[in-house]
Amino acid sequence: MAITEIQTATAGSVANLVPVVKAHIASSRFPNGGLIGVHATPTKTEYFQVVAVGGTTATDYDIVVSQDRADFTIKCNAKITAGFVPLGDMSVIQLTPGRMVEYAQAFTKA
């Protein structure tokens, strides 16, 4: 199905974004493209997910986040084992100058 409309879902945490996107899914607006995370202030990260009318449908949505790459890999593989599919590219958010980052990946289920 062709995409006929897009909108951006946004929240100040993964815990808050997931239910926002799930509400969009219930209204037939489905996640499209990768999750974007932006370090907005020294203590705040904002998360963005485009949702679209049309395109690939989904019945569920979740996000895996971790500041540890090995932990992130384990959590992502567990999501895949549970029947979820990665959505778009992962987001790597630099939290502080240097190497402190947060890895984030959105997942959907058909």
Task: Briefly describe each language-model feature range.
Residues 1-110:
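Terminus-proximal functional modules
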